[in-house]
Amino acid sequence: MTVSKIEVVADHLVRARRDNTLADAAPLAEALADAADAYAVQERVALELGWFGAAPPRYWKSGGASRDAVLTHAPLPPVGVWTSPARSGTWPFHLRGIEAEVALRLARDVDAALAATLDADSARTLIDAMAVSIELVDSRWREALEAPALCKLADLQSHGALVLGDWRAFEARDWRAQSCRVRIGAQAAVERRGTHSLGDPAFMLPAWLRHATRQGATLVAGTVVTTGTWVGILQAAEGDLVTAEFPGIGQASVQL
């Protein structure tokens, strides 16, 4: 891990966020050697911008393209986590990508020792609630979603904001039969069924918990993780009302 290169990438992202501008990822494509470097950038940006203080993050995103892929994770700035029905107001966006997701909430504290013992089944017992979530996808890179993968991971895996619907008790579900419906402004509704990339939103829990506690942090009860899109990335525009509904779980909405 080369600290100076991590600092350079982090400084670009900090400046982009502070000035609401875009940074060029192309010159930095070789600056990050691996995911560990990208996570180090995440941490440095969070520290520079004062997102979490001394406490561990309370909101996260986690997921991957398939069960065979390496899952990725990012802590989310709490100021950009909103309760549905939400309004984005003057929140600065360069993109307005829409992902319909399911968020999960921890029922108890989790430290590194507990996280190390978990498999998918035992991790599910640590969850007490679920909610529909809408992740607003954005980028601080001029190349946006075409930026190098590690640059996107360093930029919180292209995170813009998160909207959370009402919480309900977590329960076993047939996720293959679970449907979702997304409406964006005047566009035709998008409907999907059983399309979560991991087959089960809770599949990522062991990997996420080990990642989030790897440096000795304890995640406290009530910590939330949103678990990946069911609809790919849909496109919205300023002025659109976005609604995501998962029958049997709930819905969430945001006015852009």
Features from the language model and the residues they span:
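Catalytic-core "active-site belt" of small-molecule-metabolizing enzymes
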Residues: 2-200, 206, 214, 235-241, ...
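Short strand-turn-strand beta-turns centered on an Asx-Gly dipeptide
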Residues: 184-185, 227, 247
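A conserved acidic, glycine/proline-rich C-terminal tail/linker
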Residues: 204-233
